[in-house]
Amino acid sequence: MDYRPSDSSGTDDDLPPSHQGRYQRNARPTGNGRPSVLNSAPLSRVHNEMETQIHLIEQEAYSSILRAFKAQSDAITWEKESLITELRKELRVSDEEHRELLSRVNADEMIRRIREWRKANSLQSSVPQLVHDAPSPAVSGSRKKQKTSQSIASLAMGPPSPSLHPSMQPSSSALRRGGPPPGPKTKKPKTSMQYPSTGIAGRPQAGALTNEPGESGSYDPLVGRKVWTKWPDDNQYYEAVITDYNPVEGRHALVYDINSANETWEWVNLKEISPGDIRWEGEDPGISRKGGHPGQGRGTKTMARGGPASNAGGRGRGSMRMQQPKTQNGIGKKALGEIEILHTETLLKEVEKVFGSVNPNPAEVEKAKRVLRDHELALMDAIAKLEEISDGESGNI
């Protein structure tokens, strides 16, 4: 291209013409000479991906809460249901997503294992109660007759309280004979503690002991201790566990053959026992009567099973002598020795004393009095039957 000769005047007219076809008029060049044209498509894609990730996190949080609730219990309470509803709003979980997440939680392997473990655990916990409640054929008849006397027995003195911690409750194997004190390896039946199945008020069974704590309810450091006491019948030591304490009477509950079919118990004033008649596992607390001769403090009274002892001093082992050969079913017929029955009025005074501190309902007190009178009649009837059995067996000798 030819240009006119420059006259070198130094003006702009002397410069060659510029070519402006390379860039658009409105384009703004960047530092590298290229226009910055922003594309909105990549930004929209990134935004959608972030929203998706956020919602996934929300679903994971919602699913975790469902798993936690299912792990706690299969039944959802109203409080949890309300909380789940609020979380669905806050975490933007739709109904369809809720159903899908709930289905995943129910199918989760860990939740399934927890559910099976909970079901098996509940079955195991219910089995011991069923065993305790199932009476054996040999004694089912006597237990039916004992219900009335057992319900009132706890009003006066109450059975020993099962307030022991599970670790303090000795098992049946732990109560087998052969402990520190001398004596036979196996204990013969405590005949003075056993009653025939003829209607005499029997001791509360294991189920009653578990569900009906004693009236004393006072803590004593001796509760849970294991002792061996000597019986005057055979001069042998027998193992027992202290399970309760009555501070009003100053008596401790001694349970023999605990958690077994032969379980028996009595209320005892340990201070009235000669040191030679009681031995302790571990350190001797030193509360037994100092001095005296063996057997001191035992007395000749009889304890009504499940009820209070008589007002005479001494232990709950009475002077009953009921030693007879066992029958074919293993339950021996007892011969009558000597039975003392606590007067009904005395029991009524004990009941009034117990209820007086808690302002009982007068109707309930009257009901208790009626049952106590029935209790006495049942005892008298049982004694008459025992005399008949004794006379019949004496004639066969």
Curated annotation (Swiss-Prot):
Please list which residues make up the signal peptide: none
One Pfam match = ENT
Entries under InterPro entries matching the protein: Agenet_dom_plant, EMSY-LIKE_plant, ENT_dom, ENT_dom-like_sf
Domain ENT residue range list: 50-137
According to its UniProt entry, the protein's GO biological process terms are: defense response to fungus; regulation of transcription by RNA polymerase II
Q: Give the residue ranges for region: Disordered.
A: 1-40, 122-221, 284-330
Q: Does the keyword Transport apply?
A: no
Feature: compositional bias, Polar residues: 164-174
Name its cellular compartments: Nucleus
Task: Place the motif Nuclear localization signal on the sequence.
Answer: 175-182
Query: What GO cellular component entries does it have?
Result: nucleus
One annotated GO molecular function: chromatin binding
Task: Fetch the Gene3D superfamilies from UniProt.
Answer: 2.30.30.140, ENT domain (1.10.1240.40)
Q: Does the keyword Nucleus apply?
A: yes
List the SMART domains hit by this protein, alphabetically.
Agenet, ENT
* Phosphoserine, modified sites: 390
Q: PROSITE patterns given for it? A: ENT
Tell me which stretches of the chain form a coiled coil.
81-107, 363-389
| Keywords from the named record | Coiled coil, Nucleus, Phosphoprotein, Plant defense
- Say what the protein does: Probably involved in the regulation of chromatin states. Contributes to basal immunity.
List the protein's name.
Answer: Protein EMSY-LIKE 3
Q: From the UniProt record, report the name of the gene that encodes this protein.
A: EML3
